[in-house]
């Protein structure tokens, strides 16, 4: 049966979405709406006109919590009256539940943010992040709920004493969820340490559009340089210092390497300093944030993709590189070994091992034939296991199974 037929009449709430959404969430929303699923996006942002005319998609504006205390209380009062008109019993219940729930935010803020959902109904409520499910825990009693476990909120944040509320909130949300989506087997095993019942979990791996991300139709630049690329937020868990150390080793070995970094983040200054301190200014190009078209252009001009992460679920950036026909050197963080088979689509090396990264890149530089072989294998792997259309179908089946 076609996916669109299977999904007929299904109404799904995406709760706690920032705007604009992450690229992978935007792709999922569009994939679902194209299959006949009605998606309501709950966001404090203001989607632009292009999103507001997408068939089968509507927006539920949720209140922010900025401004003076008086203005926040005034907004909360107005929302309370509107919610009580829709359903007074549900409004009272929401107030009681937020007082019983532990969080890093005040009960008043959480109550205010719950009010837009009072008196409204969906077949399934979807939480793209663990923290969102914890924040909106009372919503999980309104409809069957699904939570996504993606990476850092499972394998990093629970170790932070300042985020004990997240660690302690995982088990209650797992118990209430009708199903839990994990981006990899590795993330599923990590989540099991915090109370996930594996029997209610489903692994649906990240995906990309191989029609968009594809090898260049013409030859790659051939000026003698070995072009290595990486994309991702400039944050500590991406391990950029280890990548730069590997590049430094290649330079010392006489490899004419050019390392391109695409992305921005909280540690931009640290990245700039490290490039300067390692005297890599002539070998590293930091593009900052680029448009999707700009990212594609740089991927198609590269010779290899490097992922130096300390923590991952499965990197969408790596899948985009593979779809463009690039061999990959990746750490074994999280579920990366589920996406890249060592010696087939690239090389899998230990985390924090700049020497192993350098050795793998050196092998790819010395052997253009191996680059082509691994790049072709990577694209075939994406076509077989990581197609965006297959991922959307899998989510439709998951939502339908709990509705």
Residue ranges and their predicted role:
Residues 342-343, 347-354, 363-368:
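Conserved acidic donor-binding segment of nucleotide-sugar-dependent glycosyltransferases
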Residues 112-119, 160-180:
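Membrane-proximal helix-turn-helix segments that form the acceptor-binding/catalytic region
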Residues 186, 207:
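Carbohydrate-associated surface elements
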Residues 310:
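Aromatic "clamp/platform" in nucleotide-sugar-dependent glycosyltransferases that forms part
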Residues 23-27, 226, 230-249, 266-272, ...:
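A conserved mid-protein helix/loop that constitutes part of the nucleotide-sugar donor-binding site
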Residues 327-330, 340:
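Short hydrophobic beta-strand element within catalytic cores of glycosyltransferases
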Residues 267, 281-291, 298:
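Active-site donor-binding acidic/aromatic loop of nucleotide-activated sugar
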Residues 157-160, 192, 198, 208-224:
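Acidic anion/phosphate-binding donor-loop and adjacent secondary structure
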